Protein backbone atom coordinates (compact mmCIF):
# COMPACT_ATOMS: atom_id res chain seq x y z
CA UNK A 1 0.00 0.00 0.00
CA UNK A 2 1.47 3.29 -0.98
CA UNK A 3 1.15 6.46 1.02
CA UNK A 4 -0.95 9.14 -0.60
CA UNK A 5 -0.64 12.75 0.19
CA UNK A 6 -3.34 15.23 -0.53
CA UNK A 7 -2.62 18.68 -1.77
CA UNK A 8 -3.50 21.32 0.77
CA UNK A 9 -6.67 23.22 0.05
CA UNK A 10 -5.61 26.68 -1.08
CA UNK A 11 -6.46 29.39 1.39
CA UNK A 12 -9.07 31.97 0.52
CA UNK A 13 -7.34 35.05 -0.82
CA UNK A 14 -7.24 37.88 1.67
CA UNK A 15 -9.71 40.62 0.81
CA UNK A 16 -8.15 43.60 -0.85
CA UNK A 17 -8.34 46.53 1.51
CA UNK A 18 -8.85 49.84 -0.15
CA UNK A 19 -8.12 53.13 1.54
CA UNK A 20 -11.24 54.88 2.70
CA UNK A 21 -11.77 58.58 2.21
CA UNK A 22 -12.37 60.85 5.18
CA UNK A 23 -16.00 61.84 5.43
CA UNK A 24 -16.60 65.58 5.44
CA UNK A 25 -19.30 65.92 8.08
CA UNK A 26 -21.39 68.80 6.82
CA UNK A 27 -24.07 68.12 9.41
CA UNK A 28 -21.68 68.62 12.34
CA UNK A 29 -20.04 71.66 10.72
CA UNK A 30 -23.45 73.22 10.07
CA UNK A 31 -24.58 72.56 13.65
CA UNK A 32 -21.52 74.38 15.01
CA UNK A 33 -22.01 77.24 12.57
CA UNK A 34 -25.68 77.56 13.52
CA UNK A 35 -24.76 77.73 17.21
CA UNK A 36 -22.35 80.57 16.44
CA UNK A 37 -25.02 82.34 14.38
CA UNK A 38 -27.53 81.99 17.23
CA UNK A 39 -25.10 83.69 19.63
CA UNK A 40 -24.49 86.46 17.11
CA UNK A 41 -28.24 86.91 16.58
CA UNK A 42 -28.70 87.36 20.33
CA UNK A 43 -25.88 89.91 20.50
CA UNK A 44 -27.31 91.74 17.49
CA UNK A 45 -30.76 91.85 19.11
CA UNK A 46 -29.35 93.02 22.44
CA UNK A 47 -27.62 95.95 20.79
CA UNK A 48 -30.07 96.98 18.06
CA UNK A 49 -33.37 95.58 19.40
CA UNK A 50 -33.97 93.93 16.03
CA UNK A 51 -34.65 90.26 15.34
CA UNK A 52 -33.57 89.15 11.84
CA UNK A 53 -36.54 87.99 9.77
CA UNK A 54 -36.47 85.56 6.86
CA UNK A 55 -39.36 85.21 4.40
CA UNK A 56 -39.52 81.99 2.38
CA UNK A 57 -41.89 81.73 -0.57
CA UNK A 58 -42.95 78.36 -1.97
CA UNK A 59 -45.13 78.17 -5.08
CA UNK A 60 -46.83 74.84 -5.73
CA UNK A 61 -47.02 71.67 -3.69
CA UNK A 62 -43.87 69.74 -4.51
CA UNK A 63 -43.42 67.39 -1.50
CA UNK A 64 -39.61 67.57 -1.48
CA UNK A 65 -39.68 71.37 -1.58
CA UNK A 66 -42.27 71.48 1.21
CA UNK A 67 -40.04 69.36 3.47
CA UNK A 68 -37.02 71.50 2.64
CA UNK A 69 -38.87 74.76 3.29
CA UNK A 70 -40.22 73.55 6.63
CA UNK A 71 -36.72 72.51 7.64
CA UNK A 72 -35.50 75.99 6.80
CA UNK A 73 -38.21 77.46 9.03
CA UNK A 74 -37.24 75.14 11.89
CA UNK A 75 -33.55 76.04 11.65
CA UNK A 76 -34.43 79.74 11.42
CA UNK A 77 -36.30 79.55 14.73
CA UNK A 78 -33.48 77.58 16.34
CA UNK A 79 -31.07 80.36 15.41
CA UNK A 80 -33.29 82.91 17.16
CA UNK A 81 -34.63 84.50 13.98
CA UNK A 82 -38.19 85.06 12.80
CA UNK A 83 -39.55 82.95 9.96
CA UNK A 84 -42.31 84.08 7.59
CA UNK A 85 -43.71 81.30 5.40
CA UNK A 86 -45.68 82.04 2.25
CA UNK A 87 -47.17 78.91 0.63
CA UNK A 88 -48.79 79.78 -2.70
CA UNK A 89 -50.78 77.54 -5.06
CA UNK A 90 -49.25 76.36 -8.33
CA UNK A 91 -51.81 78.53 -10.15
CA UNK A 92 -50.20 81.72 -8.79
CA UNK A 93 -49.54 84.19 -11.60
CA UNK A 94 -46.32 86.06 -12.24
CA UNK A 95 -48.03 89.33 -11.30
CA UNK A 96 -49.29 87.89 -8.00
CA UNK A 97 -45.85 86.54 -7.10
CA UNK A 98 -44.14 89.83 -7.95
CA UNK A 99 -46.72 91.72 -5.89
CA UNK A 100 -45.92 89.55 -2.86
CA UNK A 101 -42.20 90.15 -3.31
CA UNK A 102 -42.90 93.88 -3.48
CA UNK A 103 -44.69 93.73 -0.13
CA UNK A 104 -41.86 91.72 1.42
CA UNK A 105 -39.31 94.20 0.08
CA UNK A 106 -41.17 96.99 1.87
CA UNK A 107 -41.66 95.12 5.16
CA UNK A 108 -39.16 96.39 7.77
CA UNK A 109 -39.47 93.17 9.80
CA UNK A 110 -38.09 91.11 6.92
CA UNK A 111 -34.37 91.24 6.18
CA UNK A 112 -34.07 88.26 3.86
CA UNK A 113 -36.29 86.88 1.09
CA UNK A 114 -35.91 83.48 -0.53
CA UNK A 115 -38.11 82.10 -3.30
CA UNK A 116 -37.83 78.32 -3.43
CA UNK A 117 -36.73 77.06 -6.85
CA UNK A 118 -37.70 75.56 -9.21
CA UNK A 119 -40.88 77.48 -9.89
CA UNK A 120 -43.89 75.99 -11.68
CA UNK A 121 -44.04 76.32 -15.46
CA UNK A 122 -45.15 79.75 -16.59
CA UNK A 123 -43.24 81.68 -13.92
CA UNK A 124 -39.99 83.42 -14.84
CA UNK A 125 -37.35 82.64 -12.18
CA UNK A 126 -34.96 85.32 -13.43
CA UNK A 127 -37.59 88.06 -13.16
CA UNK A 128 -38.64 86.78 -9.75
CA UNK A 129 -35.14 86.68 -8.24
CA UNK A 130 -34.29 90.07 -9.71
CA UNK A 131 -37.43 91.54 -8.11
CA UNK A 132 -35.97 90.91 -4.65
CA UNK A 133 -34.08 93.90 -3.27
CA UNK A 134 -30.34 93.16 -3.49
CA UNK A 135 -29.91 93.76 0.25
CA UNK A 136 -32.63 91.15 0.98
CA UNK A 137 -31.52 88.66 -1.69
CA UNK A 138 -30.13 86.15 0.83
CA UNK A 139 -29.84 83.42 -1.82
CA UNK A 140 -27.49 85.69 -3.78
CA UNK A 141 -29.09 84.79 -7.12
CA UNK A 142 -30.23 88.22 -8.32
CA UNK A 143 -28.24 89.97 -11.01
CA UNK A 144 -26.81 92.59 -8.62
CA UNK A 145 -25.28 90.10 -6.20
CA UNK A 146 -24.25 87.77 -9.04
CA UNK A 147 -22.51 90.72 -10.70
CA UNK A 148 -20.76 91.68 -7.48
CA UNK A 149 -19.46 88.13 -7.11
CA UNK A 150 -18.25 88.08 -10.72
CA UNK A 151 -16.38 91.35 -10.18
CA UNK A 152 -14.92 90.29 -6.84
CA UNK A 153 -16.90 92.92 -4.95
CA UNK A 154 -18.62 92.46 -1.57
CA UNK A 155 -22.13 91.08 -1.82
CA UNK A 156 -24.34 88.18 -0.83
CA UNK A 157 -22.91 84.84 -1.96
CA UNK A 158 -25.23 81.96 -2.96
CA UNK A 159 -25.70 79.62 -0.02
CA UNK A 160 -24.75 76.26 -1.51
CA UNK A 161 -21.42 77.33 -3.08
CA UNK A 162 -20.57 79.24 0.10
CA UNK A 163 -21.20 76.11 2.17
CA UNK A 164 -19.07 74.03 -0.20
CA UNK A 165 -16.22 76.50 0.11
CA UNK A 166 -16.40 76.44 3.91
CA UNK A 167 -16.19 72.64 3.91
CA UNK A 168 -13.24 72.63 1.51
CA UNK A 169 -11.30 75.17 3.56
CA UNK A 170 -12.02 73.26 6.76
CA UNK A 171 -10.49 70.13 5.22
CA UNK A 172 -7.71 71.51 3.03
CA UNK A 173 -6.85 74.90 4.51
CA UNK A 174 -5.19 77.08 1.88
CA UNK A 175 -6.60 76.27 -1.56
CA UNK A 176 -4.13 78.33 -3.60
CA UNK A 177 -2.61 76.51 -6.54
CA UNK A 178 -5.02 73.57 -6.47
CA UNK A 179 -6.82 72.51 -9.64
CA UNK A 180 -10.55 72.60 -9.01
CA UNK A 181 -12.84 70.85 -11.47
CA UNK A 182 -16.56 71.62 -11.33
CA UNK A 183 -19.00 69.33 -13.12
CA UNK A 184 -22.13 71.38 -13.71
CA UNK A 185 -22.43 75.00 -14.84
CA UNK A 186 -25.71 76.17 -13.31
CA UNK A 187 -26.23 79.69 -12.04
CA UNK A 188 -27.25 78.17 -8.71
CA UNK A 189 -24.03 76.24 -7.99
CA UNK A 190 -21.50 75.71 -10.77
CA UNK A 191 -20.84 79.26 -11.94
CA UNK A 192 -20.72 80.95 -8.50
CA UNK A 193 -18.62 78.03 -7.20
CA UNK A 194 -16.10 78.68 -9.96
CA UNK A 195 -15.88 82.36 -9.04
CA UNK A 196 -15.39 81.59 -5.35
CA UNK A 197 -12.62 79.10 -6.07
CA UNK A 198 -10.92 81.52 -8.46
CA UNK A 199 -10.92 84.08 -5.66
CA UNK A 200 -9.19 81.49 -3.44
CA UNK A 201 -6.37 81.13 -5.97
CA UNK A 202 -7.45 77.84 -7.55
CA UNK A 203 -7.06 76.96 -11.20
CA UNK A 204 -10.67 76.28 -12.16
CA UNK A 205 -12.14 74.20 -14.98
CA UNK A 206 -15.89 73.84 -15.46
CA UNK A 207 -17.41 70.84 -17.22
CA UNK A 208 -20.96 70.95 -18.56
CA UNK A 209 -23.41 69.04 -20.71
CA UNK A 210 -21.36 69.63 -23.88
CA UNK A 211 -17.99 68.66 -22.37
CA UNK A 212 -16.65 65.88 -24.61
CA UNK A 213 -14.86 63.74 -22.02
CA UNK A 214 -16.04 64.72 -18.54
CA UNK A 215 -14.38 61.69 -16.93
CA UNK A 216 -10.94 62.72 -18.21
CA UNK A 217 -11.60 66.27 -17.05
CA UNK A 218 -12.73 65.16 -13.59
CA UNK A 219 -9.56 63.08 -13.11
CA UNK A 220 -7.48 66.27 -13.26
CA UNK A 221 -9.09 67.79 -10.18
CA UNK A 222 -7.39 68.09 -6.81
CA UNK A 223 -10.86 69.36 -5.91
CA UNK A 224 -13.93 67.91 -7.62
CA UNK A 225 -17.30 69.61 -7.14
CA UNK A 226 -20.24 67.80 -8.73
CA UNK A 227 -23.62 69.52 -9.19
CA UNK A 228 -25.52 68.03 -12.12
CA UNK A 229 -28.71 66.52 -10.72
CA UNK A 230 -27.81 63.17 -12.36
CA UNK A 231 -27.49 60.63 -9.57
CA UNK A 232 -24.46 58.34 -9.74
CA UNK A 233 -23.02 60.16 -12.76
CA UNK A 234 -19.46 60.36 -11.41
CA UNK A 235 -17.94 56.91 -11.02
CA UNK A 236 -14.95 56.04 -8.89
CA UNK A 237 -12.54 56.02 -11.84
CA UNK A 238 -13.46 59.63 -12.58
CA UNK A 239 -11.73 60.72 -9.38
CA UNK A 240 -8.07 61.62 -9.02
CA UNK A 241 -6.61 59.56 -6.14
CA UNK A 242 -6.61 61.67 -2.98
CA UNK A 243 -8.91 64.37 -4.36
CA UNK A 244 -11.40 66.31 -2.24
CA UNK A 245 -14.88 65.51 -3.56
CA UNK A 246 -17.90 67.71 -2.89
CA UNK A 247 -21.16 66.06 -3.96
CA UNK A 248 -23.88 68.69 -4.26
CA UNK A 249 -26.46 66.43 -5.89
CA UNK A 250 -29.37 64.92 -4.02
CA UNK A 251 -31.95 62.60 -5.57
CA UNK A 252 -34.47 60.28 -3.96
CA UNK A 253 -34.45 56.89 -5.69
CA UNK A 254 -36.68 53.84 -5.28
CA UNK A 255 -35.13 50.55 -4.13
CA UNK A 256 -36.29 47.03 -5.13
CA UNK A 257 -37.63 46.64 -1.58
CA UNK A 258 -40.05 49.48 -2.21
CA UNK A 259 -38.18 51.82 0.11
CA UNK A 260 -36.43 54.97 -1.02
CA UNK A 261 -33.05 56.49 -0.28
CA UNK A 262 -31.23 59.73 -0.96
CA UNK A 263 -28.20 59.55 -3.24
CA UNK A 264 -25.84 62.08 -4.75
CA UNK A 265 -24.33 62.70 -8.17
CA UNK A 266 -21.24 60.67 -7.18
CA UNK A 267 -21.21 56.86 -6.92
CA UNK A 268 -20.27 57.01 -3.24
CA UNK A 269 -19.22 53.38 -2.66
CA UNK A 270 -16.74 53.66 -5.53
CA UNK A 271 -15.58 57.17 -4.71
CA UNK A 272 -14.56 56.43 -1.10
CA UNK A 273 -11.84 54.08 -2.34
CA UNK A 274 -10.13 56.84 -4.35
CA UNK A 275 -10.96 60.22 -2.82
CA UNK A 276 -8.98 61.74 0.01
CA UNK A 277 -12.13 63.23 1.51
CA UNK A 278 -15.75 63.34 0.39
CA UNK A 279 -19.12 64.71 1.44
CA UNK A 280 -21.79 62.07 2.06
CA UNK A 281 -25.38 62.32 0.83
CA UNK A 282 -27.29 63.08 2.96
CA UNK A 283 -25.33 64.88 5.67
CA UNK A 284 -22.85 66.76 3.53
CA UNK A 285 -23.69 69.88 1.56
CA UNK A 286 -27.42 70.07 2.40
CA UNK A 287 -27.08 71.15 6.05
CA UNK A 288 -24.46 73.71 5.06
CA UNK A 289 -26.82 75.32 2.57
CA UNK A 290 -29.33 76.07 5.32
CA UNK A 291 -26.65 77.25 7.77
CA UNK A 292 -25.27 79.64 5.16
CA UNK A 293 -28.79 80.93 4.49
CA UNK A 294 -29.04 81.84 8.17
CA UNK A 295 -25.60 83.44 8.03
CA UNK A 296 -26.61 85.50 5.00
CA UNK A 297 -29.86 86.56 6.69
CA UNK A 298 -28.03 87.85 9.75
CA UNK A 299 -25.53 89.67 7.54
CA UNK A 300 -28.42 91.23 5.59
CA UNK A 301 -30.07 92.42 8.80
CA UNK A 302 -26.79 93.99 9.91
CA UNK A 303 -26.44 95.88 6.63
CA UNK A 304 -30.06 97.06 6.66
CA UNK A 305 -29.83 98.51 10.19
CA UNK A 306 -26.36 99.92 9.52
CA UNK A 307 -24.58 97.84 12.15
CA UNK A 308 -20.92 98.80 12.43
CA UNK A 309 -19.72 96.49 15.21
CA UNK A 310 -18.00 93.20 14.38
CA UNK A 311 -20.34 90.26 13.84
From Swiss-Prot:
Q: Which Pfam families does UniProt cross-reference here? A: THF_DHG_CYH (PF00763), THF_DHG_CYH_C (PF02882)
Write out the pathway annotation from the protein's UniProt entry.
Answer: One-carbon metabolism; tetrahydrofolate interconversion
The record's Gene Ontology cellular component field reads: cytosol
State the Gene Ontology terms under molecular function. Answer: methenyltetrahydrofolate cyclohydrolase activity; methylenetetrahydrofolate dehydrogenase (NADP+) activity
Question: What protein name is recorded for this chain?
Answer: Bifunctional protein FolD
What is an annotated GO biological process for this record, any one? L-histidine biosynthetic process
* Enzyme Commission number(s) from the entry: 1.5.1.5, 3.5.4.9
